[in-house]
C-alpha cells in the first residue's frame, strides 16, 4: 500500500506542477515571434489565369518546403508579419509523353525533368487569438516570387529516326499573394511548437526559353514562351521563438 500511496502522491504533485506551469505560460504576454519550420509543398490550383497562347505540359509534383517567418502584434488582436518560403518540387513530365504518343505511339518515348525551385517573400497583416498556452493566427499577405523552371528532355524515335527535345532551365519573377493559418503551443517562457499552412498564388512568365531539337544528326534551336499559373500549399511544422 505504501508504494501505491507514494505513486498517487507523485502523480498528484506532477499534475499540480504541470498545471502551475501552464497557468504561468498562459499569462505571459508575448507580442512578437520568429518561426523556423519545414514540411511539404503541395501543388494546387492557382487563382491566376494562364495564357492559351503560351501553354505548357510541365507540372510540379509534391515536394518539400522551408519557411522563416517573423511577426509583431501591434494591438490585442492585430499585427504585421513577413515570411520567406522556399519550395522544391520535382517536375512532372508525363503529359509530354502522352501528347507525342498520340501521333507516334511506337516511338518508345521517355521524358525527364529537373526540380521546380520557388521562393516567395511575403508580408501583410495577421490576426491572433490566445487560449491559455495555445495561440491561433490567420493572415493575408502579398509580395514577390522567384520561380525557376526546370530543364526538361523528351526523347524517342520518330518513325525510326532518333529525336530529342531539350528545354533549358530558366528563371522568372512575379508578384504573388496568399494567406495562411497557424497554431502555436507554448512549451517554455520563450519557445513554442508551431504548425501552419500557407497558400501562395502567382503567375510565372518565361519569355526566352531555349528549346533544342535534335533529329538524327540535325540540330536546331527555337525560342519559345511559357506561362505557368502557380498555386502552392505549404504545410510546415517547427519551432517558434517568442518575445
What is the meaning of each model-derived region?
Residues 1-30:
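Cleavable N-terminal export/targeting peptides
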Residues 20-73, 79, 232-243:
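Short glycine/proline- and aromatic-enriched beta-strand/turn motifs that initiate or cap beta-hairpins
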Residues 32, 64, 78, 119-121, ...:
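Hydrophobic core residues within well-ordered beta-strands of beta-rich domains
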Residues 36-40, 68-72, 84-86, 123-129, ...:
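Residues on the lipid-exposed face of transmembrane beta-strands in outer-membrane beta-barrel proteins
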Residues 43-61, 85-120, 145-174, 202-236:
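Extracellular/periplasm-exposed beta-strand and loop segments of Gram-negative cell-envelope proteins
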Residues 77-82, 133-135, 190-193:
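Repeated loop/turn-to-beta-strand initiation elements of outer-membrane beta-barrel proteins
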Residues 133-137, 149-151:
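Short, structured loop/turn "capping" segments at alpha-beta junctions
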Residues 185-194, 203-209:
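Substrate-binding/catalytic groove segments of enzymes
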Amino acid at each position: 500500500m505504501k508504494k501505491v500511496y507514494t505513486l498517487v502522491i507523485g502523480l498528484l504533485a506532477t499534475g499540480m506542477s504541470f498545471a502551475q506551469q501552464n497557468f504561468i505560460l498562459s499569462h505571459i504576454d508575448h507580442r512578437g515571434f520568429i518561426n523556423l519550420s519545414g514540411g511539404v509543398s503541395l501543388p494546387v490550383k492557382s487563382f491566376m489565369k494562364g495564357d492559351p497562347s503560351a501553354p505548357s505540359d510541365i507540372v510540379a509534383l509534391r515536394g518539400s518546403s522551408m519557411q522563416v517567418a517573423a511577426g509583431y502584434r501591434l494591438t490585442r488582436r492585430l499585427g504585421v508579419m513577413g515570411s520567406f518560403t522556399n519550395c522544391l518540387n520535382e517536375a512532372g513530365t508525363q503529359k509530354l509523353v502522352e501528347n507525342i504518343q498520340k501521333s507516334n505511339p511506337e516511338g518508345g518515348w521517355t521524358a525527364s525533368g529537373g526540380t521546380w525551385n520557388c521562393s516567395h517573400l511575403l508580408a501583410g497583416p495577421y490576426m491572433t487569438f490566445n487560449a491559455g498556452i495555445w495561440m491561433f493566427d490567420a493572415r493575408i499577405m502579398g509580395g514577390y516570387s522567384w520561380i525557376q523552371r526546370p530543364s526538361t528532355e523528351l526523347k524517342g524515335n520518330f518513325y525510326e529516326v532518333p529525336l530529342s527535345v531539350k528545354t533549358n532551365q530558366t528563371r522568372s519573377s512575379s508578384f504573388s499573394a496568399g494567406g495562411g493559418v497557424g497554431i502555436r503551443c507554448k512549451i517554455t517562457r520563450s519557445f513554442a511548437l508551431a504548425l501552419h499552412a500557407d497558400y501562395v498564388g502567382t503567375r510565372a512568365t518565361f519569355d526566352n526559353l531555349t528549346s533544342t531539337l535534335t533529329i538524327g544528326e540535325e540540330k536546331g534551336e527555337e525560342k519559345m514562351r511559357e506561362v505557368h499559373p502557380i498555386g502552392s500549399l505549404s504545410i510546415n511544422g517547427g519551432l517558434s521563438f517568442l518575445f
